[in-house]
């Protein structure tokens, strides 16, 4: 089931998850909806509260969307505490993931499991381009080191 991602929906899920998992300790960040095809969520620690962005390009179910929001909430939590590695997936991040898993039974991945892009956001690759890629691929593997050296020398 595909969920419609809106700022209001993400805000309501943030408030519910904040109350349940973080005892309402996180201030409400600015909520944005983006069109990222390589990341499902993003937290930027700027300003007083930061910005939480969720991509609308993926086919989310309720559990996956909650995992993405919680993942970004962990970054927000660490950033609010003043952790220097708040925006990375270091020890403090994994400690919070473990705490959430132990207390609530939810597994939070540091890199999201493979999620499907919605069809309208998939790049349409023409058939001739796909054929050319598979025909020329062995040559690209052989020539790549030489291209690197060529770029260094010239």
What do the PLM-derived regions correspond to, one by one?
Residues 2-64, 80-154:
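Metalloprotease/metallohydrolase-associated module, dominated by Zn2+-dependent proteases
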Residues 67-79:
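Active-site recognition of the HExxH zinc-binding catalytic motif
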